[in-house]
């Protein structure tokens, strides 16, 4: 089967042609604004002007005619609406003229599937980093699930916006990478990891302020990369332990960055897992990836009429079935974690846990020390305040800043994730009460997921090391957002589970509606907004 794929979600229009065993041809054209960033209408004009030529050249390279094509795939979303419409119109035209079937493809799905094809990865956790996208994705129960993502802007957009303010034309990423290689001074930038999610707007604001005050652009670029990339690798490693996967795959334009690739490779080596880096020519948006995803969808039984191919600028990967993937058996990581090592000890005859903050070689050493110490101190402080607020949580027995460790009460029971996977839901009412108590006390957890909640006869909240006292509504909303997404990531009937928990939360916290409205606002900020 010969498949033609058309990609056109943002700045690049591309045509790729494949069959089951060969990549036959690829032709692309990128819109490059003379000044500023991407202007959606101008990008669409560029695509409409060159798309015929791009398709013709790809057919010439493949040494076939348009009538030899058996299937047409196109990027349905997410993306810039004007660009998406140009691409979809071309795909529909080819389908109607040739009488061949057409399939609309989710753009991130294409990145994953071409990465799996060219690297040999089987069931990886994918770090997908580009201009508008920053996501950590894994396959769970028949679909790819978003385990973590940006809460504001994509990392590529952040880098490009800084570059633009510094007088560097689009795309600014490659030049920032070169400048960073000459930097030596690590500047203080916000390190914003919230559970499995990240935020980059604070880094952009601080970096622009450094630029205004005359700091060397080499040092600013170096600091942007060291800080932002460390955030990405941290959440990627956390996703491994949550999902039980033992492979990593990188894709997207930012995945071309050598420093990021080195950091991911180092993390994978320390964790004892395999890392796969998508070939450089297929990291950027391209038609081959759309053709590959369309091929897999078609072979799994997906069919679409032309009327069903409307574009969707907010199309999420977790809306798409992916039955061609068989989830690999879960890797047992034991008591290892992304940030700490857990040891079972005895404290004056009491069963206890000693949590040691471990160094991460992929991070800048100064940044690593700062993060480890701040989180350890924060966990100690917030655990005490949770107890004062009546929230079930471990009692802290000892705090040793010299060994970067905390010793605390051992809580018997199982993680909430394990209980939900076995169908237990009788604890959800109490969970809502505990979260309400925490938020009433002005405390945000910062990493409230199904793996930081222990269930026995009661519900216990653990590991608030990323938390915040004197929390604002936005901080509390991130707690609910993170918990909802971690429940959805299990692939269960998440609506019922979340609904039970939120009903109890609402009944016990007078600001719950404000928090939940902010959760909705956070979700609306995703991708190209």
From Swiss-Prot:
Domain Protein kinase: 329-529
Gene Ontology terms for molecular function: ATP binding; iron ion binding; metalloendopeptidase activity; N(6)-L-threonylcarbamoyladenine synthase activity; protein serine kinase activity; protein serine/threonine kinase activity; protein serine/threonine/tyrosine kinase activity; zinc ion binding
Binding site for L-threonylcarbamoyladenylate: 128-132, 160, 173, 177, 257
Active site: 447 (proton acceptor)
InterPro entries: ATPase_NBD, Bud32, Gcp-like_dom, KAE1/TsaD, Kae1_archaea_euk, Kinase-like_dom_sf, RIO_dom, tRNA_threonyl_synthase/kinase
Positions of ATP binding: 335-342, 355
Record's cofactor remark: Binds 1 Fe(2+) ion per subunit.
Catalysed reactions listed for this entry: L-seryl-[protein] + ATP = O-phospho-L-seryl-[protein] + ADP + H(+); L-threonyl-[protein] + ATP = O-phospho-L-threonyl-[protein] + ADP + H(+); L-threonylcarbamoyladenylate + adenosine(37) in tRNA = N(6)-L-threonylcarbamoyladenosine(37) in tRNA + AMP + H(+)
Keyword check for Metal-binding: yes
GO CC term (a single one): EKC/KEOPS complex
Subunit and interaction comment: Component of the KEOPS complex that consists of Kae1, Bud32, Cgi121 and Pcc1; the whole complex dimerizes.
PANTHER family: TRNA N6-ADENOSINE THREONYLCARBAMOYLTRANSFERASE
Entry's family note: In the N-terminal section; belongs to the KAE1 / TsaD family.
Functional note: Required for the formation of a threonylcarbamoyl group on adenosine at position 37 (t(6)A37) in tRNAs that read codons beginning with adenine. Is a component of the KEOPS complex that is probably involved in the transfer of the threonylcarbamoyl moiety of threonylcarbamoyl-AMP (TC-AMP) to the N6 group of A37. The Kae1 domain likely plays a direct catalytic role in this reaction. The Bud32 domain probably displays kinase activity that regulates Kae1 function.
Name used for this protein in its record: Probable bifunctional tRNA threonylcarbamoyladenosine biosynthesis protein
